[in-house]
């Protein structure tokens, strides 16, 4: 219960109390007047009304006191009611405080930072599922997804290969402008001749243009049948065409399996077409724009410190490596660098060299490691210090003097021909492989050192060009007890 209040003289309760006293006084006066009126009583009684009026006056005062008592009781009741009202108000205020706390918590759950932190804990598959459901249910979400896709050049840029040597930018414009507005295009040309190297890039303004162009990936451009794909996919997939002078990845045999990819390997990229005239520091600076580099460039010549046709970079984060691979073909000082994920290969053992595509590796015996398909554990690439060089590309013409040799798989000769036709000059493979300028297929002077041993192609036991075919050592074949080298002299 609350404390008793003293009634203010100006309050309604005080006014009611004063009115009650006035009414009691008026009643007493009326009673006195009635007694004073003439009656059958003696005149003496009329003259001296005091004895009879005194009791009346006392009773009037008693009535006034009783009324005041009732007024006081009413004041107490009013005070009790006011205390109860105050308690009810306090309870309502507590309930309002709890409601406000719930509203604040709900508002915090709708905060952008809170939602982002929550989504960061979700796996990618669950995020894709949630976003797909939201896009199907809400048109604005679907519009936002399409807008984000249109803003990404990786989804609008296509790579076309198999172009003729006379292809120009006008040739690509005429062939692809029908599919949508073209934002940019480029035909990659040879620096020496100015002729097309067989491939180019088209960047559409919208993703719909690229999708329309890729509905029919094979197109007749000029007198050539070409093929196109998204540039972000990476190297050309298997199944290149007979007239395709550009690179295409050779399909690996079904029995070959790659080892599990480590987290370190996922952060590593392989860059090809890196000539010896390229400054490694400038190359490092160029690839550092995609993220902080932990190691690289790896694969430099140990004597000269110059690139040997390729380079490896290891980024500190996986996101940086993915960013570097978003555009796998990069222009650097007038040269097109080809980037892709690196592959870790097995380390050499004491029993013999690694089984790579070119028989690369070291050997403690009389012969180098087996070549392509020589062992069931072989990997489709040449091993370079624990790294596996991505396998060379397939083309469809034979290497003169090699593909027709005894014990040589024609497909491998075709792959080597593709390298010579597309990138052999930039990588210096003509001299390394011992293919003369006249295309005879015979080694040039000094080519034997690059091959790891001397001998004629395909001759059993002589250490010819192709390890694993005809019983000879490969590029990694060595004299007894000597270390071998791969086809790039590493």
Curated annotation (Swiss-Prot):
Spans of biased composition, class Acidic residues?
74-108
Outcome of substituting residue 401 to S: In P1MH; reduces RNA binding activity
| Biological process per Gene Ontology, one example term | mRNA transport
Where it mainly occurs, coarsely classed, is nucleus
Keywords (A to Z) from UniProt = Cytoplasm, Nucleus, Repeat, RNA-binding
Q: Residues annotated as region Disordered?
A: 1-112
The residues covered by the RRM domain are 156-233, 267-343
Cytoplasm: is it a keyword of this entry?
yes
Might you report a single GO cellular component term?
nucleus
Question: Where does the record say this protein resides?
Answer: Nucleus; Cytoplasm
| Stretches with biased composition (Low complexity) | 13-36
One GO MF annotation is: mRNA binding
Q: What does this protein do?
A: RNA-binding protein that binds to a cis-localization element or zipcode, within the 5'-CDS of prolamine RNA. Binds strongly to glutelin mRNA, particularly to 3'-UTR and zipcode RNA. Recognizes and binds to glutelin zipcode RNA, which is required for proper mRNA localization to cisternal endoplasmic reticulum. Exhibits strong binding activity to a glutelin intron sequence and may participate in mRNA splicing. Required for the correct localization of glutelin and prolamine mRNA in endosperm cells during grain development.
Q: Fill in the subunit field for this protein.
A: Forms homodimers. Interacts with RBP-L and RBP-208. Interacts with NSF.
Q: Matching PANTHER family, A to Z?
A: EUKARYOTIC TRANSLATION INITIATION FACTOR 3 SUBUNIT G (PTHR10352)
Name of the protein described by the UniProt record: RNA-binding protein P
């Amino acid at each position: 219960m609350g404390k008793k209040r003293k009634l203010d003289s100006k309050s309604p309760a005080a006014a009611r109390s004063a009115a009650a006293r006035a009414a009691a006084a008026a009643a007493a006066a009326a009673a006195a007047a009635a007694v004073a009126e003439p009656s059958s009583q003696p005149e003496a009684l009329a003259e001296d009304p005091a004895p009879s009026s005194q009791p009346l006056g006392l009773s009037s005062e008693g009535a006034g006191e009783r009324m005041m008592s009732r007024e006081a009781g009413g004041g107490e009741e009013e005070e009790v009611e006011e205390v109860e009202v105050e308690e009810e108000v306090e309870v309502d205020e507590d309930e309002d405080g709890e409601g406000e706390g719930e509203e604040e918590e709900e508002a915090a759950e709708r905060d952008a930072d809170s939602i982002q932190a929550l989504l960061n804990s979700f796996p990618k598959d669950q995020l894709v599922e949630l976003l797909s459901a939201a896009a199907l249910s809400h048109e604005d979400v679907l519009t936002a997804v399409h807008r984000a896709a249109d803003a990404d050049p990786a989804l609008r840029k296509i790579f076309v290969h198999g172009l003729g040597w006379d292809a120009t930018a006008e040739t690509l414009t005429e062939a692809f402008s029908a599919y949508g507005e073209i934002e940019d295009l480029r035909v990659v040309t040879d620096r020496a001749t100015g002729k097309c190297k067989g491939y180019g890039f088209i960047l559409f303004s919208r993703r719909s243009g690229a999708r329309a162009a890729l509905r029919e990936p094979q197109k007749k451009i000029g007198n050539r049948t070409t093929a196109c794909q998204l540039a972000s996919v990476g190297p050309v997939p298997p199944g290149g065409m007979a007239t395709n002078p550009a690179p295409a990845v050779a399909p690996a045999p079904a029995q070959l399996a790659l080892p599990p990819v480590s987290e370190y390997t996922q952060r590593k990229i392989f860059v090809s077409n890196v000539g010896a005239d390229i400054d490694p520091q400038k190359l490092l600076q160029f690839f550092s724009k995609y993220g902080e580099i932990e190691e690289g460039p790896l694969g430099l010549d140990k004597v000269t410190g110059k690139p040997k046709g390729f380079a490896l970079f290891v980024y500190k984060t996986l996101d940086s490596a993915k960013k570097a691979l978003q555009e796998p073909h990069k222009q650097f000082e007038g040269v097109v660098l080809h980037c892709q994920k690196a592959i870790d290969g097995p380390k050499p053992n004491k029993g013999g060299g690694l089984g790579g595509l070119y028989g690369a590796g070291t050997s403690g015996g009389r012969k180098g490691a087996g070549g392509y398909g020589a062992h069931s554990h072989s990997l489709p690439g040449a091993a370079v210090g624990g790294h596996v060089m991505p396998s060379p590309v397939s083309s469809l013409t034979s290497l003169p003097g090699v593909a027709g040799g005894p014990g040589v798989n024609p497909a491998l000769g075709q792959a080597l021909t593709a390298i010579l036709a597309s990138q052999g000059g930039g990588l210096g493979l003509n001299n390394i492989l011992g293919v003369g300028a006249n295309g005879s297929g015979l080694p040039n002077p000094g080519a034997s050192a690059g091959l790891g041993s001397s001998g004629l192609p395909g001759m059993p036991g002589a250490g010819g060009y192709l390890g694993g075919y005809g019983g000879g050592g490969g590029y990694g074949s060595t004299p007894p007890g000597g270390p071998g080298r791969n086809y790039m002299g590493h």
